[in-house]
Amino acid sequence: MDTSLKNNDGASEADNKNYQDYKDESGNINDVINAIKHNSMVDCCHKNYSTFSSEWYMNERKYDDIAEGPSPKKSVVHRCTII
């Protein structure tokens, strides 16, 4: 699965969705904030690493970065900080 971003057109769409979620579900603000944090981390990791596995550790804010190529030898854990 190619998760690299050739351009960042999706960023404004994600921002719009985050705002819409906030407007529509102001009573569930904690859930919305958590979703925004998750989306921000995905965006951060997309920008900094071209590929990553689907295994997320949300509480520890880390994921396994899989090297590109036909047979990656090991996974390297990177941390992605939400600003």
Curated annotation (Swiss-Prot):
Q: Which GO terms describe its cellular component?
A: host cell cytoplasm
Keywords in alphabetical order, please: Early protein, Host cytoplasm, Host-virus interaction
Which regions are flagged for Polar residues bias? 1-10
Q: What is this protein called?
A: Protein L83L
> Does DNA repair show up as a keyword for this record?
no
User: Is Mitochondrion there in the keyword field?
Assistant: no
- Span-the-membrane segments of this chain are none
The subunit structure is: Interacts with host IL1B.
Which regions are flagged for Basic and acidic residues bias? 14-25
Q: Which organism is it from?
A: African swine fever virus (isolate Tick/Malawi/Lil 20-1/1983)
Q: What induces it?
A: Expressed in the early phase of the viral replicative cycle.
Q: What is its main location?
A: host cell
Q: Where in the cell is it found?
A: Host cytoplasm
Which parts of this chain are annotated as the region Disordered? 1-25
Physiological role: May subvert the host innate immune response by interacting with host IL1B and interfering with its function.
Protein family (similarity comment): Belongs to the asfivirus L83L family.
